[in-house]
């Protein structure tokens, strides 16, 4: 189980990313449309003004039940450990274990 503070920090990053998403997207679009290099540098400086934690690359996918940041399956939103436990308990319909 992940510490509560780490999960809260991740939620804070998600909120910041949603808040500054439009600003980042519009700045990137402006950079691609402006032909002069000096204007591009100006817009690039504006792109660096939002908080660092508002960048989408700072986000991690976390397990829905445990908060584990690694080995997550996107389709289920769970870590591999919990996913295997749910497979074994037949809690995920349509999922079968491999056997050969």
Curated annotation (Swiss-Prot):
<comment type="subunit">
    <text>Part of the 30S ribosomal subunit.</text>
</comment>
<keyword id="KW-0694">RNA-binding</keyword>
<dbReference type="InterPro" id="IPR023036">
    <property type="entry name" value="Ribosomal_uS14_bac/plastid"/>
</dbReference>
<keyword id="KW-0934">Plastid</keyword>
<dbReference type="Pfam" id="PF00253">
    <property type="entry name" value="Ribosomal_S14"/>
</dbReference>
<dbReference type="GO" id="GO:0003735">
    <property type="term" value="F:structural constituent of ribosome"/>
</dbReference>
<dbReference type="GO" id="GO:0009507">
    <property type="term" value="C:chloroplast"/>
</dbReference>
<dbReference type="InterPro" id="IPR001209">
    <property type="entry name" value="Ribosomal_uS14"/>
</dbReference>
<dbReference type="GO" id="GO:0015935">
    <property type="term" value="C:small ribosomal subunit"/>
</dbReference>
<comment type="function">
    <text>Binds 16S rRNA, required for the assembly of 30S particles.</text>
</comment>
<comment type="similarity">
    <text>Belongs to the universal ribosomal protein uS14 family.</text>
</comment>
<keyword id="KW-0150">Chloroplast</keyword>
<dbReference type="GO" id="GO:0019843">
    <property type="term" value="F:rRNA binding"/>
</dbReference>
<dbReference type="GO" id="GO:0006412">
    <property type="term" value="P:translation"/>
</dbReference>
<keyword id="KW-0687">Ribonucleoprotein</keyword>
<dbReference type="InterPro" id="IPR018271">
    <property type="entry name" value="Ribosomal_uS14_CS"/>
</dbReference>
<protein>
    <recommendedName>
        <fullName>Small ribosomal subunit protein uS14c</fullName>
    </recommendedName>
</protein>
<keyword id="KW-0689">Ribosomal protein</keyword>
<keyword id="KW-0699">rRNA-binding</keyword>
């Amino acid at each position: 189980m992940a510490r509560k503070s780490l999960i809260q920090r991740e939620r804070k990053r998600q909120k910041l990313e949603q808040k500054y998403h439009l600003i980042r997207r519009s700045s990137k679009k402006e950079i691609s449309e402006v032909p002069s290099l000096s204007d591009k540098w100006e817009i690039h400086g504006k792109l660096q003004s939002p908080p660092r934690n508002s960048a989408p690359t700072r986000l991690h996918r976390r397990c829905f039940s445990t908060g584990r940041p690694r080995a997550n399956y996107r389709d289920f939103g769970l870590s591999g450990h919990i996913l295997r436990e749910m497979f074994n308990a037949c809690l995920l319909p349509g999922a079968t274990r491999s056997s050969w």
